[in-house]
Design a protein with these regions (language model features):
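Conserved mid-core segment of classical short-chain dehydrogenase/reductases
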Residues: 86-105, 124, 128-136, 154-157, ...
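Short, small/polar-rich loop/turn modules that mediate ligand/substrate recognition or access, typified
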Residues: 177-182, 236-239
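C-terminal substrate-recognition "lid" of short-chain dehydrogenase/reductases
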Residues: 219-243, 248
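Catalytic Tyr-x(3-8)-Lys segment
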Residues: 109, 202-222
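Catalytic Tyr-X3-Lys loop
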Residues: 78, 86, 97-119, 140-141, ...
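Canonical Rossmann dinucleotide-binding motif of NAD(H)/NADP(H)-dependent dehydrogenases/reductases
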Residues: 2-33, 172
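Residue(s) in the substrate-gating loop at a strand-loop-helix junction
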Residues: 145
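Alpha-helical segment proximal to the catalytic Tyr-Lys
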Residues: 124, 173-175
């Protein structure tokens, strides 16, 4: 796909991996719609890249459809990047009792159901696109995590939500093959995001040192570069790519 002139939706685009991806897509000539709950930050990012912002709870059918409608009003919607998500930490049984079921449910709702909600709505719109010369009508990228494979203590909810994203990658790609729509997933390792930067510096340094090579935290640009390559490489479909510097997480 030639990115220039196409319309892309980036959920969670107000910060972190989503913001980095939105900025890189814009630098390549894309029209970007940022969908996020953080209105002030999202609006600021959208304004700085000449894009659009729509406040969105990705698990809401109404909110998701509003984002897709806005994107389609700008031109040909050809790409989705699902970066919106939460990362709660709670043990199955802790000092205060069993894992809060509401917290587990919320994590699944935002991370897994939210990702699928945006996929299904974007795919519906993309299926009506006039195909490119290659037959392609759109590309969708979701964000899992290496926690889907190497979940640590306290990550039952988070790992379940990201494992669900991994599990639905191939069947969705197969579902949408006849529509000329590709579906991919990126599973990031330890990345420098606002959540991680809230940790003490010594914790950040220890996490970075645990990455075999390069021994550093991943950056939003690392993620964005891979997302751009996925959009541009027509043979990438139905696969999960670990972007982790070869790290494998220990139990804690």
């Amino acid at each position: 796909m030639d990115i220039a002139g196409k319309v892309f939706i980036v959920t969670g685009g107000a910060s972190g991996l989503g913001e980095g991806t939105a900025r890189m897509l814009s630098s390549k000539g894309a029209k970007v719609v940022i969908a996020d709950m953080q209105a002030d930050k999202g609006t600021a990012v959208a304004t700085s890249i000449g894009g659009e912002f729509v406040k969105c709870d990705v698990s809401s059918e109404e909110d998701g459809q509003a984002v897709v409608t806005r994107a389609c009003s700008l031109g040909k919607l050809m790409g989705l990047v699902n970066c919106a998500g939460i990362a709660p930490a709670e043990k199955t049984v802790g000092k205060s009792g069993p894992h809060a079921l509401a917290l587990f449910s919320k994590c699944i709702t935002v991370n897994l159901i939210g990702s699928f909600n945006m996929i299904r709505l974007c795919a519906d719109a993309m299926s009506r696109n006039e195909p490119e010369a290659t037959g392609e009508r759109g590309v969708m990228i979701s964000t899992a995590s290496i926690a889907a494979f190497d979940g640590q203590i306290g990550q039952a909810a988070y790992s379940a939500s990201k494992g669900g994203i991994v599990g639905m990658t191939l069947p969705i790609a197969r579902d949408l093959a006849r529509n000329g729509i590709r579906n991919m997933t990126i599973a990031p390792g330890i990345f420098g995001t606002p959540m991680l930067f809230s940790f003490p510096q010594e914790v950040q340094d220890a996490l970075a040192a645990g990455v075999p090579f390069p021994s550093r935290l991943g950056t939003p640009d690392d993620y964005a570069k891979l997302a751009v390559h996925i959009f541009e490489n027509d043979m990438l479909n139905g696969e999960v790519i670990r972007l982790d510097g070869a790290i494998r997480l220990a139990p804690r």
